Amino acid sequence: MTNATSAPPARADRAPASKALFDRAAAVLPGGVNSPVRAFRAVGGDPLFIARAQGARLFDADGAEYIDYVGSWGPAILGHAHPAVIEAVREAALGGLSFGAPTELEVRFAEKIRELYPSIDMLRCVSSGTEATMSAIRVARGFTRRDAIIKFEGCYHGHADHLLVKAGSGLATFGAPDSAGVPESIARTTLSLPYNDPAALEAAFAARGGDIAAVILEPVVGNMGCVPPEPGFLALVIDLCRKHGALSIFDEVMTGCRLARGGAQERFGLRPDLTTLGKIVGGGMPLAAYGGRADVMRVVSPLGPVYQAGTLSGNPLAVTAGLATLDRLTPALYERLEELGASLEEGLRAAAEGAGAAACVQRVGSMITLFFTKGPVRSWADAATSDTKRFSAFHAAMLARGIYWPPSQYEAAFLSGAHSEEDIERTIAACREALAA
């Protein structure tokens, strides 16, 4: 791995194999990638192409080694290529890759999720977080027979049309599309409100409570950086939904099994009506799920009129990886993640203060963000004050020192059980140098 005290080489000279692969990719993939954040557009330069991963390490196409804080954007809570998960998937593959028919494995998976999440009576497996949130909203609309939904600025729930929406100019105005290709007629059914703003939420329900099918949110936001809920905010969401006949949806694709075995709802002691899960529950494979109250989930086909299907839903390899991962989420793992997270938080904060940087560090469990703004960051409006140019320079300097930090100011970093105390020390040392550069 690059020594944290060595002078960083020029970026173009550091990864010629990645550069060659990116040039090839640009000819056949839009932007050279299969998901926009991977292109490094937010931080400049070309992305690294990863050849393999092990534990808390990534190895790029040029053979360089990095301490990884992206963790495949959250799933790798045990670290990469955990031997037990790899062996379970290898054994399952010998029995067939996909059947398009029910299996005992998917029943065991559903039973395990229900054990971890008391709010979930029944669930349906899908293949991505976008599918999970899209389906949960369809279920909420079908159950309530209403169309409007509330989301919060800075909360990302996948790329379904009705979720790629930003707020209009007024409190309860119609939404406007945040992406080309999203019809305004669809966007108008989505109300976007400031996160952590109880007054705005109460006013929206007062104005349009009878139209609202659901409120969906990340209970701890990770897609504008790590932003925790203000005390009482999550409970208010649930209470207002119940009062007005709407459904509360916790999007725990990121926080599920990350903040606790039972996710944010275990950590905060709350039970939403519907929950979406992904990332960790798939053990690094394409697996997600949505579920909740039995009376709500009974509207899902073939029991009810809300249609949702998928060729690879409940895929045996993905479910096997998920079960192997879930079985290894022990109290000791979360204690270790908390200790490592606290050490990293303290070190990053001290490094920022020592450099005189206008920055703040926010962490919940093993999710953490160094914001280049004074903070605290409670909403998208706060996050948007971050100095993204300073972050880009920081990211490049960290990468040059062997630290693979998320390539966006607005993405949380993740710790895993494979990180060591030495990894944390190296990362803090690299951060001190990066901030002084």
From Swiss-Prot:
SUPFAM superfamilies to which the protein is assigned, alphabetical: PLP-dependent transferases (SSF53383)
Lineage per the UniProt record: Bacteria, Pseudomonadati, Myxococcota, Polyangia, Polyangiales
Pfam families per the UniProt record, alphabetical: Aminotran_3 (PF00202)
Gene Ontology biological process terms in this record: protoporphyrinogen IX biosynthetic process
UniProt record similarity statement: Belongs to the class-III pyridoxal-phosphate-dependent aminotransferase family. HemL subfamily.
Protein name in the entry: Glutamate-1-semialdehyde 2,1-aminomutase
Keywords of this entry: Cytoplasm, Isomerase, Porphyrin biosynthesis, Pyridoxal phosphate
Keyword hit for Metal-binding: no
Gene: hemL
GO cellular-component term (any): cytoplasm
Subunit structure: Homodimer.
Modification type N6-(pyridoxal phosphate)lysine: residues: 279
Superkingdom of this protein's organism: Bacteria
Pathway where this protein functions: Porphyrin-containing compound metabolism; protoporphyrin-IX biosynthesis; 5-aminolevulinate from L-glutamyl-tRNA(Glu): step 2/2
